């Protein structure tokens, strides 16, 4: 099969990369009604599969789970999760033929096998749903022309999808209809109903395309969301220990530092994160971030180029065919790093201490977020999509590191994200070592002393931070989410 994106001409590629529209709340006035009374069969009961299914059932939809015969016979985790939550479970042959909508929520590497198994069983005119478009865009899966193909992609891990729904809200979501598979023109109605059933319409929905979702998602997870956090963790830990910091303290400062720093990012963007620093520290963090952007820009651009061309996907799929040899080797090597094996620190680190002693980490976050955003936008991806795939998801990934270091992050994210993370971090760590050798006292592990600052310089730095395009679009999108949350709570 041919990579779908590469079969398009340049005009079509640019049109699909640039498809992005923030949908009004009034467009979801009918909620999930378009799917009520219809049979929705979910294939896969992992984090997204289970939690989307729970939300959809609570929204009044008929949900069941189709699993492989072996998974049912051996009572595997997917079978246990579905049955323990009271769902009907059956084999593909038992459930797929009656389904009006089949939702494929298995891991990327299983998509081709799953689609080839379920497609012959699907009734004429049924719909096939995805929450990530890799199989369609990168693999180039060919779907029967009578089948409608849609996507609903929550911009959060599955557990968060459920928790926000239970709070009466939802998570920001991208929806799309595959232009090659919308025979009855009902794709958007199906996608909107599915998104509403998960609660996504309460947090904001972007009408996107399979292409824009895949290319931006891959770029975000490889660079700022996972790769930068992994490279930054390893580099910062080694630097602290080399300069005499207790390994246990160094580990805690980094493990929980990302989460504390990005919580400010979540609430008020890069502006608020930088405002948590003293004026001298802010000026230093800004200078460091500008140096980092200059050093890392070619690496970010290479990742984007390889994603656009399909080079990344072909390399990863070759590793799938080789029993994940590269992925498993990189995973094992990461587990043996000094950061992952360091002892735990039993003392307390105050919230402000993470900022005061983590100026370099803040600079890394700022540089990584801005570079990922800028590189995506330069490649034709609309700013709203680039924001969701860079700044918005970063606090969620940082939270996984706070739980069980890099191990937890790499367990929670998809194998696709993990593979891309290793590609980036293995290139980024040696790239930044000369930069790390030139750091000054106060950049990491100790606070920068208070002192006089140049007012004009501080003014210019503040203006540069606040006027960046990601701050402008971020303020708008965070405002939508806040407004919608108030409406949801009031309702």
Curated annotation (Swiss-Prot):
Gene3D superfamilies listed in its UniProt record: N-(1-d-carboxylethyl)-l-norvaline Dehydrogenase, domain 2, NAD(P)-binding Rossmann-like Domain
Binding locations of NADP(+): 45-48, 68, 76, 78, 108-110, 158
GO cellular component: a single term: cytosol
UniProt-listed Enzyme Commission number(s): 1.1.1.86
Cofactor(s) required for function per UniProt: Mg(2+)
Binding site for Mg(2+) 2: 217, 389, 393
Catalytic activity annotation: (2R)-2,3-dihydroxy-3-methylbutanoate + NADP(+) = (2S)-2-acetolactate + NADPH + H(+); (2R,3R)-2,3-dihydroxy-3-methylpentanoate + NADP(+) = (S)-2-ethyl-2-hydroxy-3-oxobutanoate + NADPH + H(+)
Molecular function terms, GO-annotated: ketol-acid reductoisomerase activity; magnesium ion binding
Highest taxon listed in the record's lineage: Bacteria
Note accompanying the cofactor annotation: Binds 2 magnesium ions per subunit.
Major enzyme class: oxidoreductase
Ranges where the KARI N-terminal Rossmann domain occurs: 15-208
Pfam families: KARI_C, KARI_N
Keyword annotations from UniProtKB, A to Z: Amino-acid biosynthesis, Branched-chain amino acid biosynthesis, Magnesium, Metal-binding, NADP, Oxidoreductase, Repeat
Residue sites binding Mg(2+) 1 per the record: 217, 221
GO process annotations (BP): isoleucine biosynthetic process; L-valine biosynthetic process
Pathway participation: Amino-acid biosynthesis; L-isoleucine biosynthesis; L-isoleucine from 2-oxobutanoate: step 2/4; Amino-acid biosynthesis; L-valine biosynthesis; L-valine from pyruvate: step 2/4
Active site per the UniProt annotation: 132
Domain KARI C-terminal knotted per the UniProt entry, residue ranges: 209-344, 345-484
Residues holding substrate: 414
Transmembrane spans: none
Protein family: Belongs to the ketol-acid reductoisomerase family.
Role noted for this protein: Involved in the biosynthesis of branched-chain amino acids (BCAA). Catalyzes an alkyl-migration followed by a ketol-acid reduction of (S)-2-acetolactate (S2AL) to yield (R)-2,3-dihydroxy-isovalerate. In the isomerase reaction, S2AL is rearranged via a Mg-dependent methyl migration to produce 3-hydroxy-3-methyl-2-ketobutyrate (HMKB). In the reductase reaction, this 2-ketoacid undergoes a metal-dependent reduction by NADPH to yield (R)-2,3-dihydroxy-isovalerate.
UniProt-recorded name of the protein: Ketol-acid reductoisomerase (NADP(+))
């Amino acid at each position: 099969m041919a990579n779908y994106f590469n079969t398009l001409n340049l005009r079509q590629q640019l049109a699909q990369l640039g498809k992005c529209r923030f949908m009004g709340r009034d467009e979801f006035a009918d909620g999930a009604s378009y799917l009520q009374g219809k049979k929705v069969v979910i294939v896969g009961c992992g984090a997204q599969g289970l939690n989307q299914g729970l939300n959809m059932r609570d929204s009044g939809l008929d949900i069941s789970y189709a699993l492989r015969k072996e998974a049912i016979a051996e009572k595997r985790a997917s079978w246990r999760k579905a049955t323990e939550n009271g769902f009907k479970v059956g084999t593909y042959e038992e459930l797929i033929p009656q389904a009006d909508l089949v939702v494929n929520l298995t891991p990327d590497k299983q998509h081709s096998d799953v689609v080839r198994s379920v497609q012959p069983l699907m009734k004429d005119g049924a719909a096939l749903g995805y929450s990530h478009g890799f199989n369609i865009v990168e693999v180039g899966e060919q779907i029967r022309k009578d089948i409608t193909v849609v996507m609903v992609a929550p911009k959060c891990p599955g557990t968060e999808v459920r928790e926000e729904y239970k709070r009466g809200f939802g998570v920001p979501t991208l929806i799309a209809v595959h232009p090659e598979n919308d025979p009855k023109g009902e794709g958007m109605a199906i996608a909107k109903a599915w998104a509403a059933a998960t609660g996504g319409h309460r947090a904001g929905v972007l009408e996107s395309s399979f292409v824009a979702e895949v290319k931006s998602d891959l770029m975000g997870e490889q660079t700022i969301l996972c790769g930068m956090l992994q490279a930054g963790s390893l580099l910062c830990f080694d630097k602290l220990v080399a300069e005499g910091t207790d390994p246990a303290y160094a580990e805690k400062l980094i493990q929980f530092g990302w989460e504390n720093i990005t919580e400010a990012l979540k609430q008020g963007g890069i502006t608020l994160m930088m405002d948590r620093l003293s004026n001298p520290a802010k000026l230093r963090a800004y200078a460091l971030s500008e140096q980092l952007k200059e050093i890392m820009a070619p690496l970010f651009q290479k990742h984007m180029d390889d994603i656009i061309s399909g080079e990344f996907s072909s390399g990863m799929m070759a590793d799938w065919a080789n029993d994940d040899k590269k992925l498993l080797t990189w995973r094992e090597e990461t587990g043996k790093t000094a950061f992952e094996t360091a002892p735990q620190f039993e003392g307390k680190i105050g919230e402000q201490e993470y900022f005061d002693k983590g100026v370099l980490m803040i600079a890394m976050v700022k540089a990584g977020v801005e570079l990922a955003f800028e590189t995506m936008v330069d490649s034709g991806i609309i700013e709203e999509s680039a924001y969701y795939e860079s700044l918005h998801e970063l606090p969620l990934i940082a939270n996984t590191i706070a739980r069980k270091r890099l191990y937890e992050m790499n367990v929670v994210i998809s194998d696709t994200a993990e593979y891309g993370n290793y590609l980036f971090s293995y290139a980024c760590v040696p790239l930044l070592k000369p930069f790390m050798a030139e750091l000054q006292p106060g950049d990491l592990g100790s606070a920068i002393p208070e002192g006089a600052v140049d007012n004009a310089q501080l003014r210019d730095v503040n203006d540069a931070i606040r006027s960046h395009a990601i701050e402008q679009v971020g303020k708008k999108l965070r405002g939508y989410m806040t407004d919608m949350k108030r409406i949801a709570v009031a309702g």
